[in-house]
Structures are given as structure tokens and as C-alpha cells.
């Protein structure tokens, strides 16, 4: 008898259940260089870094056992990969949480691919962002956000819904 928790319902005409295997990896890494005692550079001590990685892949029951445990298996692009999702977020902070000024640079990337009966559905987003904040006379903050984004979608079954959009945004705030 097979545990039904390993089954995922995939909407088909006959509403059948198919066994799939899921592998995922979540990672958060954070470095505050100001905590290092032996650094003599005041500039470097004001930096902090943060990195978030999330990977999730689902494979068919025909996948080899070791590949079922591998969250990077989607890189092989085989027919056993039913879906994958990846998320990467990197941030560099300068003078983080300082009451006078701070600067933040970030990169966010997300990808997903789903295998349907009609073909693959792929989505991709990439964002670059720079944010700076300065306090003026201890009364108000001036903030500037600059971002650049690439967003795309590729659907094998319906080419009219495919797109790739590049955008740039500048947002000053007081």
C-alpha cells in the first residue's frame, strides 16, 4: 500500500493521481562585517550582506532515486522534471539602520517552469534595485528608489501569451 501523501492531484480529463517526488532547498546567509573585530577599514565595517536561496523541484516517478533528493535536478531539463521554482535574493547594505543615511543594493531573480499536457509554461523575473535614504535636519527623510526589471513568460501551447518586458523605474520620496 502506498502512502497517499506522496501523490499530487494533477487536473486531467480523468482526474487521475500521479506520484511525484519533491526536493527543496532553502538557505539564508547573512554577514554583518561590522561585527568583525579585526577589520581596520571603517568603510568595510559599514557593509552587511544577505543572501536567500529557495529551490523546489518535482520529478515524476520514473526519476532515479538519488535524483529525487536533488533540488538542482531541474538543471538537467529532462522529461522527468514536472515543475521547478527557483528564487534568489541578494542584498548589500551600506550603513544599515543608521539614523542619518543608508544605501541598499539588491538583486532578485525568480524562475518557474511547469510541464503540462499541452507543453511547458515558463516564467522569469529579474529585478535590480538601488535604494538610498538620507535624513535632513532630523525632521524628514529623502528616499530615492531606482529599479530595473525584466519579466518574461513563455507558454508552449499559446504563443500569443508569450512576452518579455523590460522596465526602469525611478521613485523619489520625501
Regions of interest found by a model, annotated:
Residues 1-174:
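Exposed, low-structure sequence patches enriched in small/polar residues
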Amino acid at each position: 500500500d502506498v502512502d497517499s501523501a506522496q501523490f499530487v492531484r494533477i487536473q486531467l480529463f480523468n482526474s487521475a493521481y500521479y506520484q511525484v517526488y519533491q526536493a527543496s532547498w532553502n538557505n539564508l546567509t547573512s554577514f554583518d562585517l561590522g561585527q568583525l573585530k579585526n577589520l581596520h577599514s571603517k568603510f568595510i565595517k559599514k557593509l552587511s550582506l544577505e543572501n536567500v536561496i529557495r529551490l523546489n523541484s518535482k520529478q515524476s516517478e520514473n526519476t532515479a532515486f538519488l535524483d529525487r533528493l536533488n533540488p538542482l535536478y531541474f538543471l538537467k531539463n529532462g522529461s522527468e522534471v514536472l515543475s521547478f521554482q527557483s528564487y534568489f535574493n541578494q542584498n548589500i547594505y551600506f550603513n544599515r539602520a543608521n539614523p542619518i543615511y543608508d544605501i541598499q543594493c539588491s538583486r532578485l531573480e525568480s524562475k518557474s517552469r511547469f510541464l503540462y499536457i499541452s507543453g511547458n509554461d515558463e516564467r522569469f523575473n529579474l529585478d535590480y534595485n538601488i535604494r538610498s535614504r538620507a535624513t535632513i535636519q532630523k525632521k524628514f527623510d529623502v528616499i530615492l528608489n531606482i529599479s530595473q526589471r525584466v519579466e518574461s513568460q513563455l507558454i508552449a501551447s499559446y504563443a500569443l501569451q508569450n512576452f518579455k518586458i523590460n522596465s526602469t523605474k525611478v521613485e523619489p520620496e520625501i
